[in-house]
Each structure stands twice: as structure tokens, then as C-alpha cells.
A protein has these predicted regions:
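Solvent-exposed loop/turn segments at secondary-structure junctions
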Residues: 10-13, 56-60, 85-89, 114-119
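Short, glycine-/small-residue-rich phosphate/pyrophosphate-handling segment
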Residues: 80-116, 123
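N-terminal beta1-alpha1-beta2 submodule of the flavodoxin-like/Rossmannoid cofactor-binding fold
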Residues: 1-52, 59-61, 66, 70, ...
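Short glycine-rich or small-residue beta-strand-to-loop segments that form or flank ligand, phosphate
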Residues: 48-54, 79-83
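A short acidic/glycine-rich loop-to-helix N-cap element
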Residues: 120-128
Length: 141
């Protein structure tokens, strides 16, 4: 069986300037801001399991994911949350789990923490091993 991938995007895009987006992100996370989202183009009623990933922003899920997870009815669904971060995971997975259950998920399983380098010149270097990531993906298949 295949999978369907849907991107969660804000209606108003973030700046491409690193300093501007980090300042904006810090403010939004601290305020619990939930931005307006573009439609994902997928009817979640057709799925039993939903895998949701987020970058970690100031120890929490990104505002777009907070907005999405707050607005979705997960009744009868199994939710698999994952996060990416550079060494400071915070409460992201716990928060995602609580929100999924609050919105009706029957089960939250196989939550995954994916770590990248915190070295500014190597931020795209994944520190979680490919073997570990492949094993997690295999569990989900």
C-alpha cells in the first residue's frame, strides 16, 4: 500500500531571512499563535493512520502544526508524531500526543525524535542514524 503526503502550509508565508523568521517564530510560539493554513488537499476521513511531523521551534511544535492539530478531528485515527530538532526537543512530542488525544485519536504510537546537528555550518546533517530512521520507517509500513 502507498501513502499520501500532504504539506501543511501557512496562508501567509514566512520570510526567507533567517533572523526575521527566528524572531517571528519565537514570538508566535510564546503567544501560542495559530496561523491560518492553506487547505491540505486531502480528506483525512479516508485514512486510519496519520503521520505528522514538525520542526521544533523553541522546544515546541511549529505554529502551523499547532494550528493544524488543533483544528483536526482525529476521532478513530491512530496518530504517529515526529519531530526534528538540533538538540533541544523540549515538549514537542508530548504536546503533539496530548493534542491528538484531546481531538479524538484512539492511539498515538511510535513517536519519533529526529536529531540534526546544532553546528551552524552543518544544520542539515542528521545525527539520528539512517539505520535508526530506517527501522522506524519499517515499523510504520
Amino acid at each position: 500500500e502507498g501513502s499520501t503526503i500532504a504539506e501543511i502550509e501557512t496562508k501567509v508565508p514566512y520570510s526567507t531571512d533567517y533572523n526575521k523568521v527566528t524572531d517571528q517564530g519565537d514570538k508566535e510560539v510564546n503567544e501560542g499563535y495559530k496561523p491560518e493554513l492553506k487547505p491540505i488537499g486531502v480528506d483525512l476521513k479516508n485514512f486510519d493512520r496519520i503521520i505528522i511531523g514538525t520542526p521544533t521551534w523553541w522546544y515546541h511544535m511549529a505554529p502551523a502544526i499547532l494550528s493544524f492539530m488543533s483544528s483536526v478531528d482525529f476521532t478513530g485515527k491512530v496518530v504517529v508524531p515526529f519531530q526534528t530538532h538540533a538538540g533541544w526537543p523540549g515538549t514537542t512530542l508530548e504536546d503533539m500526543t496530548k493534542l491528538a488525544k484531546k481531538n479524538g485519536a484512539i492511539k498515538v504510537e511510535h513517536a519519533k525524535d529526529i536529531k540534526f546537528s546544532s553546528n551552524m555550518s552543518h544544520l542539515d546533517k542528521m545525527e539520528t542514524s539512517e539505520k535508526e530512521l530506517s527501522a522506524w520507517i519499517k515499523i510504520l509500513q
